[in-house]
A protein has these predicted regions:
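Conserved N-terminal structural module of periplasmic/extracytoplasmic solute-binding proteins
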Residues: 4-9, 15-100, 419-425
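Short helix-initiation/N-cap motifs at beta->coil->alpha
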Residues: 73-82, 240-258, 272
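A structural signal for short loop-to-beta-strand junctions that line the ligand-binding cleft
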Residues: 85, 89-92, 120-153, 179, ...
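Hinge/lid segment of periplasmic solute-binding proteins
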Residues: 98-149, 161, 167, 286-288
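Extracytoplasmic/periplasmic substrate-recognition and gating elements
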Residues: 136, 279-347
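Extracytoplasmic/periplasmic solute-binding protein
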Residues: 139-143, 149, 170-222
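Glycine-centered hinge/linker elements that transmit conformational signals in sensory
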Residues: 209-245
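Conserved C-terminal helix/tail region of periplasmic/extracytoplasmic solute-binding proteins
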Residues: 355-358, 370-425
Length: 425
């Protein structure tokens, strides 16, 4: 891959040098043009305009790119793995959701990120790095870190110290006669919690990208502590399995026979409900990262799932053309750079993965974006997932709800959970 970058550097120097020579020698009719390529990008319809604008800005950064033209296909990030039937005629640079990395890798649609571009990705933090990696390789460029959750709370009823730990939050809610809404019976939330003390999974793949083995350590002390945290929260009287704006006022959650009247003072939820919650709460609206939890004397910040959107580079359209592939990587790298993420935030208020952009006043003023950015350092990337990701945690939560799983027998349940997670379908 370094050779690809070198060839592009040589190409750039050659073009610039010839342009300079020709400007000083008007009688020289010999010219060398920059290579002409049509680079096809893909992503959502909403991102078409800003992506093409940024591509044109990239083109203007070097004479070596002056021969480029850009095309855009509207292919949803959640569908690109199945919507593209033939990757030899697919998009060159495409946007995708982080949980699509396994099928895209298996189809040979992912070119490894060149070493020179790794520092920019690594500076984004462990969540973004994790989302971009599979099979021991960094395969993509993260640009949107917004598909995750954090804590909304009523700042007229709770102080910052009340929401710093889950134990303190539940105790304060009990004092107020209110509830903390945390949908732990749903795997998206319970699975996120189970990473809190460091338990995780690892994949082994074959040369075709198929998963051949999954190992995990949720049956270790790290997993057992997470299991105890799940039990401690779900058995607390102030905990409630729901979502809802924490207005502190009477409200109804659920539907039909499962509907209950309640007063919610804090809620774990995602960016997608920020506008609704802010409208419902008015000046009581506040949000922050998830609180800490303490088990057996060890304190950790509650973990979460965080889904990303990334740019992948398709090697099949370059067909061995190293210069074209290098240009595609350079474009993808530019699209996740500081200036591009700043412009994308202005255009679409997309949650930046670049830490400098995330720290800007205009970004931090949007509290839900600041909160998810703060939580990102404690989040597990929703990237490559075991087949049982959405069933095994649900079964675990059900065992707690039914009174079957307790802090005394949590080791047995976490051993069974570990077996379920590592079982290939």
């Amino acid at each position: 891959m370094k050779k690809n970058l070198l060839s592009l550097s040589i190409l750039t120097l050659s073009v610039m040098g010839l342009v300079g020579c020709n400007s000083n020698n008007k009688n020289n009719s010999s010219t060398v043009e920059a290579p002409k390529y049509t680079i096809t990008l893909s992503g959502s319809g909403e991102n078409r305009e800003i992506t093409l604008q940024l591509a044109e800005r990239f083109k203007a950064t070097s004479e070596a790119y002056s021969g480029l033209t850009f095309d855009y296909r509207e292919i949803g990030e959640d569908k690109v793995d199945s919507a593209v039937a033939d990757w030899t005629t697919g998009p060159d640079v495409y946007s995708y959701a982080s949980d699509k990395i396994i099928p895209l890798f298996a189809k040979g649609a992912m070119s490894e990120v060149p070493e020179d571009y790794l520092p920019q990705i690594e500076a984004m933090g462990p969540g973004a790095v994790g989302a971009a990696k599979f099979a021991g390789k960094t395969l993509a460029y993260p640009y949107d870190g917004g598909n995750g959750y954090f804590l909304y709370y009523n700042k007229n009823l709770l102080k910052a110290e009340d929401v710093s730990s889950i134990e303190g939050l539940l105790a304060k809610a009990t004092t107020l006669g209110m509830k903390v809404a945390y949908e732990l019976e749903t795997a998206f939330y319970s699975m996120g919690l189970l990473f809190t003390f460091g338990a995780d999974w690892q994949f082994t793949t074959n040369s075709q990208g198929a998963v051949t083995n999954i190992t995990a350590d949720f049956n270790s002390d790290k997993g057992i502590k997470a299991g105890k945290a799940l039990v401690n929260i779900m058995t607390n009287p102030a905990w409630q399995n729901s979502l809802g704006a924490p207005t502190g006022k009477d409200s109804t959650v659920g539907e039909g026979e499962s509907a209950v009247k309640t007063k919610i003072v804090a809620c774990v939820d995602g960016t997608w409900n920020a506008a609704q919650y802010k409208q419902a709460m008015g000046d009581a609206y506040a949000c922050t990262k998830l609180p800490t939890v303490t088990v057996d004397g060890e304190t950790k910040n509650l973990s979460s799932f965080l889904g990303y959107k990334l740019f992948g580079v398709n090697p099949q359209t370059s067909s061995g053309d190293a210069t074209r592939l290098s240009i595609c990587h350079a474009l993808a790298n530019y699209l996740v750079g500081k200036d591009a993420q700043d412009a994308r935030f202005d255009a679409r208020t997309i949650v930046p993965t670049n830490r400098e952009v995330l720290a800007l006043d205009k970004v931090q003023k949007m509290e839900h974006i600041a909160a998810i950015g703060e939580q990102a350092q404690y989040a597990h990337a929703q990237g490559a997932l075991p087949d049982t990701t959405w069933t095994a945690p649900t079964n675990l939560s059900a065992a707690v709800k039914n009174g079957e799983m307790t802090v005394e027998n949590v080791g047995t349940y976490m051993a069974n959970f570990n077996t379920a997670i590592t079982t290939l379908k």
